[in-house]
């Protein structure tokens, strides 16, 4: 990629600090015990994990289970392992260079190409936001009976949520997000237990099947799962928020320790996200696969299935279906927090443009609400069409992903830039393989889709 102009003479200290209001604000002492160091770095991974279990993951995983049983568990496994590798690369990028991925991309691309990458990054954040709008609007409908259009409009005002929470410090944000994540996890562990999945079929789902490639329907959902699992905005987000910890920016030793514990944090939280996504697909498969409604598997279907589940009874079924809707709303609001931060990182990093957070959030959320409102009007509130829009947004994220991965790969494999923290050879091989395979699958899917129009 000839437009990359890596220059070892660039001075990182001339860069504006990423997310300056939280950068270098949380204590980390390299002389502490291993457990204290781990606790000091426990947090950024939680915010990243949110993106791996947002409403986009819910619908793609549930539909994958409803339509194709446990076949796509293998895709969730591979996506999660790939995500751990890629997020570890963003950790090293942020800590080793003092720049986030957006700053790095802008710094080492010529201006026209950097603008193109910025536009794609912004569209990816809007696509992520569409999933949050739809998930939150459906949750409001399920809990309070609020019409979808009204619910979608209400989500515009959650712009003020992060602004309020930020007043209490970044650690409080991490704690709130972590609490909501474990709430969602607990709900789905119980609900999957009630749904009585086939354990042997589940285990077989982690074995690759050729139908994933040969069946366009399965491939479409698989790309949606990949897009919902490995999300572009998370790469920008993670490379920035790991810099919130205090460590000597000039010490190789302290940077190495920071990278070590930030990576452990990331892998632990992404393992939790992996379990949640497997539970989501399992729930869809256990309730719908092999029945007359196997082509559904949307939020409303799952809500109704839980509410009318004979094994639960009327009272417990009502409680569990309500908890499902509450978890969906919590997931959407959780993603709002991380989406806001990622949007700020992308705009400031690519454009060196700093605007009030409330205005930035209002613009992004408004751009996400518009297509949802249009879809609701055109299809007269058809919930199935709205859920299809959510799946499409996740497929777009998969298509946009290489535009984040390529700069990340090129930057983290550069000796002058990364020094002793550059990618090992095996990481370069795997990351380039991921980029090539994902790009090839995207091209194939687009061609097949247009041929059937």
UniProtKB/Swiss-Prot annotation:
Name of the protein in its database record: Divalent metal cation transporter MntH
Gene Ontology CC, one term: plasma membrane
MF terms (GO), sorted A to Z: cadmium ion transmembrane transporter activity; manganese ion transmembrane transporter activity; metal ion binding; symporter activity
Compartments it resides in: Cell membrane
Keyword tags: Cell membrane, Ion transport, Membrane, Symport, Transmembrane, Transmembrane helix, Transport
Topology term for the membrane: Multi-pass membrane protein
Role summary: H(+)-stimulated, divalent metal cation uptake system.
One GO term of the biological process aspect: iron ion transmembrane transport
PANTHER family membership: NATURAL RESISTANCE-ASSOCIATED MACROPHAGE PROTEIN 2 (PTHR11706:SF33), SOLUTE CARRIER PROTEIN FAMILY 11 MEMBER (PTHR11706)
Family classification: Belongs to the NRAMP family.
Pfam families: Nramp
Top-level taxonomy: Bacteria, Bacillati, Bacillota, Bacilli, Bacillales
Transmembrane segments: 39-59, 66-86, 114-134, 146-166, 175-195, 217-237, 270-290, 310-330, 362-382, 388-408, 427-447
InterPro entries: NRAMP_fam
